[in-house]
Amino acid sequence: MPNILKRWVESDRRTLRRLSNLADKVGAYADDYAQLSDDDLKAKTPEFKQRYQDGETLDDLLPEAFAAIREGAKRVLGLYPFHVQIMGGIVLHEGNIAEMKTGEGKTLTATMPVYLNALAGKGVHVVTVNEYLSARDATEMGELYNWMGLTVGLNSAEKSPEEKREAYQADITYSTNGEIGFDYLRDNMVVYKEDMVQRPLNFAIVDEVDSILIDEARTPLIISGQSEGTSALYRRVDRFAKTLHEKDDFKIDLESKTVALTDTGIEKAEKYFNLKNLYDTDNTALTHHMDQALRANFIMLRDKDYVVQDGEVLIVDSFTGRVMDGRRYSDGLHQAIEAKEGVEIQEETKTMANITYQNLFRMYKKLSGMTGTAKTEAEEFREIYNMEVVSVPTNKPVVRVDEPDLLYPTLESKFNAVVKEIKDLHEKGQPMLIGTVAVETSEYLSQRLDEENIPHVVLNAKNHAKEADIIQNAGQRGAVTIATNMAGRGTDIKLGPGVVEIGGLAVIGTERHESRRIDNQLRGRSGRQGDPGMTQFYLSLEDDLMRRFGSDRVKSFLERMNVDGEDAVIRSRMITKQVESAQKRVEGNNYDSRKNVLQYDDVMRQQRDVMYGERNQVINQDKSLKWVLMPMIKRTVDRVVSLHTQGEQSDWDLDTLLDFGISAMVSPDKISLDDLKNKSADEIKAFFMELAEDVYAEKQKQLYDPAQMLEFEKVVLLRVVDSHWTDHIDAMDQLRQSIGLRGYGQLNPLVEYQQDGFRMFEEMISDIDYDATRLFMKSEIRQNITR
């Protein structure tokens, strides 16, 4: 182990040395560029573009381009990137992750690789976690890019397709991750090329990259249509779930957050729903609803996982503590929670297009990201995204003091200690940021502070509209801010007058999050740019994390230390280590789970690539699509004829072939049984293909304008493909829900999913061939056809 660590440290040192040397080359141009007039500096942009067109690479241009935009930033923004920021910029240009501590100027760092890569003219996307940050950065940094002669676009949800297209055509586009994903999916659902808004995905710099590529990795982006509502079934199953008792009827696995019926529970269900066998294939819809009702009633917690506002169930993001507007749990879980809470059940939806962030961002030719906390997830970034995490040194040393964790026996004794600490610090005027994991904790703490007459503001999922303003003032003397997790991320907490002298910003964590990275983010709000600061986490044996993973070992440790009583407290590095090892286990579980999602989504990705690729070929075609249609007809003819001409000729089913000819190929007067008799199977196939050629020629004659013929072909293909593809996505979703049960039969669910998914995909292709054949051959031609 020591050898491995030594190699890692050496490798990191070598990387930083190389980056520092390259940053020196950028610095070498500083004096020359400072002498240039504004016009001469601006003229560098077209000069670099021309040199790129003439064969120089972006790597060749890096030292001069970085120096030019650095000088531009000094003149336009009054900010001059430090040496370490240039190093961070190089990391981003190379398609890796720059881990830069809070307050080290990530936004300014990104200007250098953004400018350099925009010179290629293929588009650069700067991706942020919310629209507030997108708009802020597009406005502030856009001033610099515009001055240097580049165009900047801002993409947001409320923009029209025309405005979106314009934003994507710009050299640099600011957008949230969700909007890029939905635009990608919508682009692959349009029926006219002109309706597409995106260019091919070229280079993205993802701000708060850990939040987007790790915390949200499992969140699929889904475009859906209405499905048949089944609210009566949700209510009925919910009523049943509420009759069950834990241990007797069902068991909860806290680690994996799953609920399973016991034999007694299964018997109760069969009696309640009057069934012989609950797990019969005829009952899959019922068992699916039951799984969701069990999760809704016994796993999903109100005010932690979701809140109920104005008769609506709203999801709370477990990482940021924010309400996720417009998001609904899929697969009927949301409806099950609505039934549990007795609010109106909204219709279930059918998935029409979907993709995970993992697969969306892996489609970029080059991807990079920046964040204050990524090192703990370095392995995941390397394995899934092929990106290295480079910890960029701070401009000034970090002088913040991180105290060892304090551990209390109960929640009550812990919160008494937290309130006392807040009171003490408030008396000397030191500003505090108090981090909580759940909305209910922030409200409970707020109530306790009201009782003590301590003025404070609460930032949680219920009021995040003003979060940037609140967080900006959190560093003023006497400010007390309670925030769920990473509310206000991306906004700096600057210290007010006189705060440095009393110790800077104090960060108090009321619980450890299951991810070390989220704890590190909270710590990182204090001690920016060499400011003083202090962080302290308060834990209790009744905390979620301790209950799930840490408590047995810690309890025995407390017993050995003879610690008892309500007010007992332990401050020990050993406790901190225990907690971190519990967190590593959770992180390991979460990583495995994300990897698992990716393996399943990769099956869909391959299918999606095939379908979207074919679809785009059809949409972009400007001549004839005969080369697509005729092979589809041939595959259909070959399959149908082969199926009905097996064995001896006397056993062939010519009547069914005649029916096929009439229903899918031509009118009854064009074919008879005599046409099929006394022919070999190959001759029958050839006969059908002759008919197809005749019909094609006839339609061409009717539509004498080639453009109209092409439009007719596109209508046929797009209608058939889209209808079958959306059904297929939905079927794959259902397959995925049910596949886990096969794990109990000693089968590997992933392998089963891959095999069944492939078989279903092949069946869909056959169905598309058949329906396209029938629609093309049998359609009446109209002049005004629309897709």
From Swiss-Prot:
SMART domains per record: SecA_DEAD, SecA_PP_bind
GO molecular function, one term: ATP binding
Reactions performed catalytically: ATP + H2O + cellular proteinSide 1 = ADP + phosphate + cellular proteinSide 2
UniProt-listed Gene3D superfamilies: Helical scaffold and wing domains of SecA, P-loop containing nucleotide triphosphate hydrolases, SecA, preprotein cross-linking domain
Membrane disposition: Peripheral membrane protein
Uppermost EC category: translocase
Biological process (GO), any one: protein import
Positions with a binding annotation for ATP: 85, 103-107, 492
InterPro entries tied to this protein: Helicase_ATP-bd, Helicase_C-like, P-loop_NTPase, SecA, SecA_CS, SecA_DEAD, SecA_motor_DEAD, SecA_preprotein_X-link_dom
Family annotation (CDD domains): DEXDc_SecA, SF2_C_secA
Key words of the record: ATP-binding, Cell membrane, Cytoplasm, Membrane, Nucleotide-binding, Protein transport, Translocase, Translocation, Transport
PROSITE patterns found in the cross-reference section: SECA, SECA_MOTOR_DEAD
Enzyme Commission code: 7.4.2.8
Compartments (UniProt record): Cell membrane; Cytoplasm
Any one cellular-component term (Gene Ontology): plasma membrane
Short name of one Pfam family: P-loop_SecA
Lineage: superkingdom: Bacteria
Family as reported in the entry's similarity comment: Belongs to the SecA family.
Subunit structure: Monomer and homodimer. Part of the essential Sec protein translocation apparatus which comprises SecA, SecYEG and auxiliary proteins SecDF. Other proteins may also be involved.
Primary role: Part of the Sec protein translocase complex. Interacts with the SecYEG preprotein conducting channel. Has a central role in coupling the hydrolysis of ATP to the transfer of proteins into and across the cell membrane, serving as an ATP-driven molecular motor driving the stepwise translocation of polypeptide chains across the membrane.
NCBIfam families for the chain: PRK09200.1 (NF006630), PRK12904.1 (NF009538), secA (TIGR00963)
Protein name: Protein translocase subunit SecA
Organism for this UniProt entry: Levilactobacillus brevis (strain ATCC 367 / BCRC 12310 / CIP 105137 / JCM 1170 / LMG 11437 / NCIMB 947 / NCTC 947) (Lactobacillus brevis)
Gene: secA
